[in-house]
Every structure is written in C-alpha cells, then in structure tokens.
Amino acid sequence: MAKTIYIAGLGLIGASMALGIKRDHPDYEILGYNRSQASRDIALERGMIDRATDDFASFAPLADVIILTLPIKQTIAFIQELAGLNLKEGVIISDAGSTKAAIVEVAEEYLAGKSIRFVGAHPMAGSHKTGAASADVNLFENAYYIFTPSSLTSPDTLEEMKVLLSGLHARFIEIDAKEHDRVTSQISHFPHILASGLMEQTAFYAQEHEMTRRFAAGGFRDMTRIAESEPGMWTSILLSNRETILERIEDFK
C-alpha cells in the first residue's frame, strides 16, 4: 500500500533521502518542508518530492512517516511541536541527527503515551557540499545507517523503516543512543575540532610566514577538508555532545 512520507529539511541529507525512497517506492507520495523557497523549488523540479511547504505543521497530519533531517536544535523543537498535533494513529517519527541522546530523551518525554512511534537515526554519510542542489541518490550507498532504538521503538517499527529506506542501499545497524554519542565523539566530532583548529592556527601562522599558503598541499588538504563543513550545523552538533567531546580532548592531552 502506498504511503505518505514527510521529509522536513531539504538539504543534502533530506533531499538525497527523498531520491533514495523514490527509487524503491515510486508510488509513495513524498512531502517536503523547507524554509528556503529555492530549496523547495529544486526538490520539486528534480522530482525529489511531490509537494512542498514552508509551514511545518501543515503536512504533518497527512504523513505515515515523518523524517526530520534538520539541525539538532530544530529537530528537538519540532518533536515537541509534533507532540501537540493531530497526527495519524501509529505514525512513525524519525530523525537524522548527528548526536542521539538528547533527541531520544526529548522524544521519550514528549511522545510517550501517544499513538506515535519514534526511531532515532543517524545516516553516517555526508559531504562538504550542502543543499538540495547537491542531492545524490547514491550518497548513502554502503554507508552505515544507525538506528538508536528507545522505549518508543518496536522491532516491527525498525523493520518498516528498513523497508522504507531500502533504496538508500545503506548498511543498517542498531546501537544505544549514548554509546552512539561516545563513539561518534571520537571518530567524527573530535576530528572536526582538530581540522578546524588547524585551519585557524595556520591562518594566524601565515600572517608572518607568507609561503605557508603556497606550500600547503595534499596532506594539509586531506587533514583540513572537513573544516569546510557548514559551521552552524557543527556548532549545534558539538554543543549537543559537549561532555563526551570534552572527555576526548582530555584523552588527547
């Protein structure tokens, strides 16, 4: 039976996810939310979504599955908003946040006791590119798509999500939300701090050593590439996993 999928956030992740869902489920209706008119237009023109809105609450009651592909702070705010809306019975809400413990905690607090299912998730894929214009149906291929089950997640719900996302060609795995945040602090968040710190330090160094920029080559680019990522998004990620990241910094010392 055809379903209605609502993707809130039509950036690189959300738009690429829409393409993947369309690949295996062309009969599903995909609704999209984004504040940017340009992003909505691109998603519609490329056939990623069927309808678009800049009013988040307007499409939520129509959806069988709602996926929040937004910055962490906004994801949390929208989970709180969804708790007060008249949603379909048994609707699945999921997210794509880079940290999980805070999101899962809010979901369990606000969605408990309702006919709502929640599945925390983090697709371990991305790029320094951003926006719907950079969407790629193969973005998630062979990448880990991590689910962080909670008290609001049943085995049947997990299976439904895996079927829905089959067109992403990702590798699904399940892990506790807090353990997810500990592991990603080491292999994702802390490396980003190192890359950004190296870029900042090099900029100051180059003020007195003019050949610095000219000599910086492959090794330097490899180490600092991730520092190009969108700073607002990374500020949200780092602040939401602050204590665990501070532990990694202490370990590094």
Where do the model's predicted regions map?
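Conserved short alpha-helix immediately C-terminal to the canonical SAM/SAH-binding motif I
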Residues: 38-39, 74, 100-103
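Internal alpha-helical scaffold of NAD(P)-dependent oxidoreductase catalytic cores
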Residues: 139-226
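NAD(P)+-binding Rossmann beta1-loop-alpha1 motif at the extreme N-terminus of oxidoreductases
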Residues: 1-61
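Interdomain hinge/lid region at the active-site interface
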Residues: 208-253
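Rossmann-like NAD(P)-binding element
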Residues: 57-87, 91-92, 98
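Residues at the starts of beta-strands that form the adenosine-phosphate
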Residues: 4, 29, 117, 144, ...
